[in-house]
Amino acid sequence: MKFLLAVAFFILISLCIEEAYSKEKSSKKGKGKKKQYLCPSQQSAEDLARVPANSTSNILNRLLVSYDPRIRPNFKGIPVDVVVNIFINSFGSIQETTMDYRVNIFLRQKWNDPRLKLPSDFRGSDALTVDPTMYKCLWKPDLFFANEKSANFHDVTQENILLFIFRDGDVLVSMRLSITLSCPLDLTLFPMDTQRCKMQLESFGYTTDDLRFIWQSGDPVQLEKIALPQFDIKKEDIEYGNCTKYYKGTGYYTCVEVIFTLRRQVGFYMMGVYAPTLLIVVLSWLSFWINPDASAARVPLGIFSVLSLASECTTLAAELPKVSYVKALDVWLIACLLFGFASLVEYAVVQVMLNNPKRVEAEKARIAKAEQAVGKGGNVAKKNTVNGASTPVHISTLQVGETRCKKVCTSKSDLRSNDFSIVGSLPRDFELSNYDCYGKPIEVNNGLGKSQAKNNKKPPPAKPVIPTAAKRIDLYARALFPFCFLFFNVIYWSIYL
């Protein structure tokens, strides 16, 4: 028995603690919430009686106490005409990948509601500026943006809604919105394109029998000076139209639209795409002036050009939507890539001409013949001795004790002495030398030694001769490639500009 009492007491204490905690939590939530405004039609008679009779609040209560926001003005009568105008605060750049743009606007709607005519005893101004909390108490058009992707209201620091009620029953509502709107792009002329982006305002539930949207006369869309990073937008290029739509089963729904014409600025793409790719193509032509034998210089130059252009194509493709048609920029990049690839193909043709088997065999035979001719010339030079000399030289010998110098010495002192007495005593195997007996070089202006030195000098090896056909290909390429690229530029810019 005592055990059951203890359990019951424990359960009772737990319930009390839980109830106290829930009350504390709800009170904290209530403090954080803003007090909700009740429309006059929802307030009790006692609450309405507390309002002073001559106050503006009392006049509003008298207007709205029997007001039903669920019923449109002129119910079962003529449709309500809603005059619309827009003030554009900011205009975001168009995103090519998602095909949309973002705007920040003041949307203003004005209509007449006979139920909201101010009483004759109202002595204030012709319009009442009403707190946005009363906006929910009024009937309002069910406007939405037909091509909207996302949108949001602004409530910093207060809810950005402005409400006016005029003496004759006109109601003006202005609200600040940020909207992302779809804009289907035609990128055929990209980046020299002009885009037309729409903003469509449509009724969601009311047909044309109940509601009609009308653009305000004058300038329904007010646009201040707005600078976009890639586009130019001007007030003169804004168009207005009617886009009333028919939906099967429900009928016609009112719709108005504004069309913004945006012209793309080409400067960014000129500096970032066209100029670099043009220079890369011109760089690939430098290989035509490099010796065909210099493969280490020509091949990397061509490969660098092709890879750079291919990388540029890949980078731009990632930044643009995947469309099924060819854009103007694609035509340019493909043409530049073909010119770079053609320079590589041209060098391949030159290499085929250089490595032709018949040409290689003929070159080997020519080099061998040249080497044989050089060998014969060296033997003739070695036979040029004193007795075979055509020009007389002054020679002398040096004798130390009983040993004679092992070579004939020619010196400047001998040339001055004009001594020919020892010529007959020289053995036949002695040869002239350009060195004296002490191994020092001497200069002989008209003697046999200088002639023999020239003849004994080994000639350089024969250089391979580049075929005329290979040279002709490079020569033609130097003129043909720039001419073709210039012709392509004339056609390209005349079409797309």
UniProtKB/Swiss-Prot annotation:
Subcellular localization: Postsynaptic cell membrane; Synapse; Cell projection, Dendrite; Cell membrane
Chain segments annotated as transmembrane: 269-289, 295-315, 328-349, 473-496
Binding-site residues for glycine 1, renumbered to this chain: R108, S174
Site (Important for obstruction of the ion pore in the closed conformation): L307
Assembly behavior: Forms heteropentamers with glycin receptor alpha subunits. Heteropentamers with GLRA1 can be composed of two GLRA1 and three GLRB subunits, or three GLRA1 and two GLRB subunits, or four GLRA1 subunits and one GLRB subunit. Forms heteropentamers with GLRA2. Functional GLRB-GLRA2 heteropentamers contain four GLRA2 subunits and one GLRB subunit, although alternative subunit composition cannot be excluded. Forms a heteropentamer with GLRA3. Interacts with GPHN.
Keywords assigned by UniProt, alphabetized: Cell membrane, Cell projection, Chloride, Chloride channel, Cytoplasm, Disulfide bond, Glycoprotein, Ion channel, Ion transport, Ligand-gated ion channel, Membrane, Phosphoprotein, Postsynaptic cell membrane, Receptor, Signal, Synapse, Transmembrane, Transmembrane helix, Transport
Main location as per UniProt: membrane
Annotated membrane topology: Multi-pass membrane protein
Residues reported in the UniProt entry to bind glycine 2: T250
Residues with Phosphothreonine modification: T391
Organism: Bos taurus (Bovine)
GO cellular component: cytoplasm; dendrite; GABA-ergic synapse; glycine-gated chloride channel complex; glycinergic synapse; plasma membrane; postsynaptic membrane
A molecular-function term among this protein's GO annotations: glycine binding
Glycosylation sites: N54, N242
UniProt GO BP: acrosome reaction; adult walking behavior; chemical synaptic transmission; chloride transmembrane transport; gamma-aminobutyric acid receptor clustering; monoatomic ion transport; nervous system development; neuropeptide signaling pathway
Catalytic activity field: chloride(in) = chloride(out)
Family: Belongs to the ligand-gated ion channel (TC 1.A.9) family. Glycine receptor (TC 1.A.9.3) subfamily. GLRB sub-subfamily.
Entry protein name: Glycine receptor subunit beta
CDD domains in the record: LGIC_ECD_GlyR_beta, LGIC_TM_GlyR_beta
Function: Subunit of heteromeric glycine-gated chloride channels. Plays an important role in the down-regulation of neuronal excitability. Contributes to the generation of inhibitory postsynaptic currents.
Cited Gene3D superfamilies: Neurotransmitter-gated ion-channel ligand-binding domain, Neurotransmitter-gated ion-channel transmembrane domain
Signal peptide positions on this chain: 1-22
Keyword Ion transport in annotation: yes
